[in-house]
Design a protein with these regions (language model features):
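N-terminal non-catalytic cap/leader segment that marks the start of a structured domain
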Residues: 1-99, 268
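A generic local secondary-structure boundary/capping motif
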Residues: 4, 67-69, 89-92, 116-125, ...
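Short beta-strand-to-turn element immediately C-terminal to the catalytic PLP-Schiff-base lysine
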Residues: 6, 16-18, 90, 112, ...
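Catalytic-pocket segment enriched in acidic/His residues
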Residues: 8-10, 87, 93, 163-285
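Structural signature of FAD isoalloxazine-binding scaffolds in flavoprotein oxidoreductases
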Residues: 95-112, 127, 262-273
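Short catalytic-site patches enriched in acidic/histidine residues
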Residues: 103-119, 139-140, 180-189, 248-252
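Non-heme Fe(II) oxygenase catalytic core, chiefly the N-lobe of the double-stranded beta-helix
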Residues: 111-147, 152, 157-161
Length: 285
C-alpha cells in the first residue's frame, strides 16, 4: 500500500494508491475519515482497514493538492550519521564501530514540493539523500532478527544540513535542525511491498538533474534492523517514530570546491520503488 498525507484548501487529508494506479482519499472533516497516519499508527489501527475506507473516498490528484510530510509530527526523529563507509571517508572520519546518532525536530520538516530554505546566516546548505524507516509497532530491547517486523513502511528524506553550523560544536544538532531543511516524502510505502530492509534498492540524489549521490541501500554499515535493535536497547520505540538511516558519499561538503545548494536549484532524492522526493531551494526572506 501507498499512503499520501495532503491538504486541500487548508484541510488535511489522507489518500491511498488505488489498484487502478490513481489516488483516492478523504479530508479529515469528511464522514468516515479514518484518521491521519500518526493517529492510525498511535492507536494501532489497521492500515488495511484505513486503505479500504480511503479507496471508497473521492479521487485525489496529488498534483493539485498540497502534500504534507508523510508524518508531520513523528514521535522521535532518530538520525544515523556516517552510515556509509565512503561517506565517512570523504568526510574525514574514521568509520565508527557504533551508530552515530543525532536527532531532528519536527519544526524542521517539510514535504515533497515544498522549498528547502537556505538561511541568511550561511551559504553552506548541503544535500543528504536518505532512506526513512517508519516504526509501526513499538518496543524495547527488540532483537535484530525481529526488528523489521516493527517497521510499517519506508519513505525518503533529504537531511539538508547547514555545514558550518553543524561543525561549530562536537554535537551536530544545530546544523541539522534549521527550519525548513528536513524534506520527508513523497509517500509512505508499506513494508509488504518492498524487500526486507529495502535491500537491493538504489538511492540516487540529483542536483539540477546531475547525479551527485548514488549507492545501494545494502551499502549501509548498520542496516535498518541493526539500527532498531541497537537504539531500542536504550530507548523505547513507539509507533510513528522514524529512523533517517544515513547518507552515502557525494555530499557537497566533500567536493573541491564545495558544492552548496543555492536559490533556484532543484534537489531530487530517488529510491527504487519509493519514488522521487523533489524540492526547490530558496533563500530565506
Amino acid at each position: 500500500m501507498r499512503f499520501a498525507s495532503f491538504a486541500e484548501k487548508g484541510v488535511n487529508g489522507l489518500a491511498v494508491r488505488t489498484k487502478a494506479g490513481g489516488w483516492s482519499g478523504l479530508l479529515e472533516n469528511a464522514d468516515g475519515f479514518p484518521g491521519s497516519l500518526e493517529t492510525l499508527l498511535s492507536r494501532g489501527n489497521s492500515l488495511n482497514d484505513a486503505a479500504a475506507i480511503l479507496a471508497r473516498g473521492k479521487p485525489v490528484d496529488l498534483d493539485q493538492v498540497t502534500l504534507l510530510p508523510v508524518l508531520s509530527n513523528p514521535g522521535k526523529i532518530i538520525c544515523v550519521g556516517l552510515n556509509y563507509a565512503d561517506h565517512s571517508a570523504e568526510s574525514g572520519f574514521k568509520q565508527p564501530d557504533y551508530p552515530t546518532l543525532f536527532g531532528r525536530f519536527n519544526s524542521s520538516l517539510i514535504a515533497h514540493g515544498a522549498p528547502i530554505v537556505r538561511p541568511k546566516l550561511s551559504e553552506q546548505l548541503d544535500y543528504e539523500g536518505e532512506l526513512v524507516a517508519v516504526i509501526g509497532k513499538g518496543g524495547r530491547n527488540i532483537p535484530k532478527a525481529r526488528a523489521l517486523d516493527h517497521v510499517v513502511g519506508y519513505s525518503i528524506f533529504n537531511d539538508a544540513s547547514i555545514r558550518d553550523y553543524q561543525f561549530k560544536s562536537p554535537q551536530w544538532t544545530m546544523g541539522k535542525n534549521f527550519d525548513d531543511t528536513g524534506a520527508f516524502g513523497p509517500t509512505l510505502v508499506t513494508s509488504d511491498e518492498l524487500p526486507p530492509g529495502c535491500f537491493g534498492l538504489k538511492l540516487v540524489t540529483r542536483l539540477n538533474g546531475q547525479v551527485v549521490q548514488s549507492a545501494m541501500i545494502d551499502d549501509m554499515v548498520f542496516d535498518v534492523a541493526t539500527q532498531i535493535a541497537l537504539v531500542s536497547e536504550a530507548i523505547t520505540l513507539s509507533p510513528g517514530d522514524i529512523f533517517v538511516t544515513g547518507t552515502p558519499s557525494g555530499v557537497g561538503l566533500a567536493r573541491k570546491p564545495p558544492l552548496w545548494m543555492k536559490h533556484g536549484d532543484i534537489c531530487e532524492v530517488e529510491i527504487d520503488q519509493l519514488g522521487i522526493l523533489r524540492n526547490p531551494i530558496v533563500d530565506q526572506k
